[in-house]
């Protein structure tokens, strides 16, 4: 059963943070790469701390072993310096898919008692 084995590692490019540069009066999009470096198929989901400012497309999916996906992280226009951006980040959550499951994302993979791993990518805003 896949859930008894902890999910393996993923890699992200960039590896530690996402940087957006001013001006912030227009929407910015930054692409990141998520790589399943484990030997098992995983399901992933992306969360953001500020859903009205930050978006991710696609927000979830399934990756086979060694497979990668590009995600578009977008930052909508906002009043820089007038809004709190200190805790902005995106979080990649992933878990092993059940053995024999179709390659189609299912939210319930994250709601059972299986192990879910997380990687936080803080957002940095350059003035």
UniProtKB/Swiss-Prot annotation:
Keyword Glycosyltransferase in record: no
Function statement: Central component in molecular interactions underlying sperm crawling. Forms an extensive filament system that extends from sperm villipoda, along the leading edge of the pseudopod.
Other notes: Around 30 MSP isoforms may exist in C.elegans.
Domain MSP: 9-126
Superkingdom: Eukaryota
Subcellular location(s) of the protein: Cell projection, Pseudopodium; Cytoplasm, Cytoskeleton
Family annotation (InterPro entries): Ig-like_fold, MSP_dom, Nematode_MSP, PapD-like_sf
Stated name of the protein: Major sperm protein 33
Tissue and organ distribution: Sperm.
